[in-house]
Amino acid sequence: MMRASLLAALLALAPAATAQTQADIPALRKEAKADPAIKAALDDKTRTMDARLEDDGRMVEIILKAIDAKPGERAIDIGSGSGYLALLVSSMVGPKGHVDMHNTPGWINQFPTMEPERQKIRIKQPNIGWVTTTWTDISGAPNSYDIIVMGQVYHDVFLEGESNDAMNERLFAMLKPGGRVVIEDHDAIETMPLAQQVGLHRISHGDVAGQMIRAGFTLKTMTLLESTHDDRRFNVFRPGVRGRTDRFVAVFEKPLK
């Protein structure tokens, strides 16, 4: 069966309540910014200027609205990098919550500033922890996380020669029933071979949905953030495209039973 046909079959199994929407971006941003928890996280005085300068291009308030972190929840930010999203979620879950920052050994070797001991010099929040594993070796106690976040890194799993399916099985086991996985990434041409998509540092929202549904997750919402400046034939780092790509924010849930 062709990948597109398999994807169509998987999506047909998704609940009718699933919403796939082309976002009214200004309205969505305005609504998200009005959320007191999001506003407090964005205004946190411990945030660096570099992080604040990233907010507008990332439209991060839309991502935080999808994450919907609540006080006391436990989260993991996979492929966390510098901790941009993890630190925002840390503010939202508060002192009784917890956020783990995950990076791979390969990333740490390439970018030494991601090394946990170096990050601990800068990051002082007591509700932050660190996890270092490959994508497919990531593990946690069964049913231990309320939230799993992947910001612009889901495509990296395949790009780096690992299996998204193998990783997703582990994510499913780690997540509490009713918990959610929020994936934001650069959208791709769905008919393009997957290896070609990820070579452009992209992955189509349909491919992600198909893989996550296959792992047992339910697709709850798929918000499409389209840009007039993007051309999905090109690498996301191409001048004129970089920072202005078509993106999606997908929310998946682990069924209660």
Segments and roles (model prediction):
Residues 146-165:
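A short SAM/SAH-binding and catalytic strip from SAM-dependent methyltransferases
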Residues 133, 138-148:
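A short acidic, Gly/Pro-enriched loop at the edge of an enzyme's catalytic core
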Residues 231-257:
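Core SAM-dependent methyltransferase catalytic element
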Residues 83-87:
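Glycine-rich SAM-binding Motif I of class I
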Residues 72-81:
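Conserved class I S-adenosyl-L-methionine
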Residues 90-94, 163-177:
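A short glycine-rich, Lys/Arg-flanked "PGG" loop and its adjoining helix->strand segment in the class I
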Residues 178-186:
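Conserved beta-strand signature within the Rossmann-like core of class I S-adenosyl-L-methionine
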Residues 34-64, 70:
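Class I SAM-dependent methyltransferase Rossmann-like catalytic core
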